[in-house]
Amino acid sequence: MNLSLSDLHRQVSRLVQQESGDCTGKLRGNVAANKETTFQGLTIASGARESEKVFAQTVLSHVANIVLTQEDTAKLLQSTVKHNLNNYELRSVGNGNSVLVSLRSDQMTLQDAKVLLEAALRQESGARGHVSSHSHSVLHAPGTPVREGLRSHLDPRTPPLPPRERPHTSGHHGAGEARATAPSTVSPYGPEARAELSSRLTTLRNTLAPATNDPRYLQACGGEKLNRFRDIQCCRQTAVRADLNANYIQVGNTRTIACQYPLQSQLESHFRMLAENRTPVLAVLASSSEIANQRFGMPDYFRQSGTYGSITVESKMTQQVGLGDGIMADMYTLTIREAGQKTISVPVVHVGNWPDQTAVSSEVTKALASLVDQTAETKRNMYESKGSSAVADDSKLRPVIHCRAGVGRTAQLIGAMCMNDSRNSQLSVEDMVSQMRVQRNGIMVQKDEQLDVLIKLAEGQGRPLLNS
């Protein structure tokens, strides 16, 4: 029996009212709650039940091409934060709206299903009132495969364009090619401009994709592992150290170091980098649940005291700061000691509940960027008052930022910090993301929703998305 949209919504809503919203749904004739376990983002191959997959796919069939508002996606983000798993691949369609491209598992919570089905009911109701305006409704035709329907709606409206010329790209394909401009009649923040931005950045990402033993990227030496992820590599020209996946990044006038979460074997080198840099702030965006997951191999290096080779580290928590939307920043002080070297104190900002491959809101991002900037400025002033030689060295006193891979959450924060700097008022979003990608790797600003946050921040400043 194929449930209609209204029947499916009614059954799901009833179960949510019975406080089963966090359970995954299952479907055999009627909808039921799987109360035996919590949502784990499983596929059939990793242990999801067939009835869970049937439920998830049935919901998906009703929400293909449905426009999700910012309020809808905020509700889905609440679920992502709660379970520390992002189950949804979303794509922006402009004006803060998104569509669901696909699920990342064969499970779906009943609460999330309710959010999606209510969005479908809203659009269906609106379509009835505008039958003659079918061009505004892209509802999924019965019998059309879900992915085919989604793909037809999401195809880019403009062909990919080559990356723009910029001084740092002489070693990359596409350098020196002519720049394309957006038509003057296009809204600077509308769907056409966003699609053009996405197209240009996708082209650059593909150009920068690493080949086997690619000379553009740092290669492991001496048998030691260098990269957490095979496809997320470290630009050789801007590498901080030969044994770390870490890069000097300069976006406009904003200088930082972006790196991956250090491997256990890299901790001594990582601490040495922090000390030599006279790091004014270390921003760790990897969540506490990621660090606790032993499968990820992420040593809890900044919240605990310890000895790493010749380096001794003492950690002390100082305060906790709310950033909004329930996102919290824990503040620590790391004291790094090594025989024959100056003792270095590094402030740490740890955001412990920002899940991987997601975006926090523009408001939270602004608050985090301001906190990191203010912390760094206080420390820089201390070094300046002591007459430190690091003040005159452009390679030092840089905030060090990492999440897990050092490309998604990390790049979202760096982009916001760049926009906080009044010296960068002429930079477009295309400029900022392109500079990050060229200087580290093509995956910087990993997810569409992370780019959407930077776009929203830019729009609030009247900053262009594209270069003219």
Swiss-Prot record:
Leader sequence residues: none
InterPro entries per the UniProt record, alphabetical: Prot-tyrosine_phosphatase-like, Protein-Tyr_Phosphatase, ProtTyrPase_YopH_N, ProtTyrPase_YopH_N_sf, PTP_cat, Tyr_Pase_AS, Tyr_Pase_cat, Tyr_Pase_dom
Region annotated Disordered, chain positions: 127-194
Subcellular localization, as worded in the UniProt entry: Secreted
UniProt-listed Enzyme Commission number(s): 3.1.3.48
Subunit structure: Monomer.
Function: Essential virulence determinant. This protein is a protein tyrosine phosphatase. The essential function of YopH in Yersinia pathogenesis is host-protein dephosphorylation. It contributes to the ability of the bacteria to resist phagocytosis by peritoneal macrophages.
Protein name listed in UniProt: Tyrosine-protein phosphatase YopH
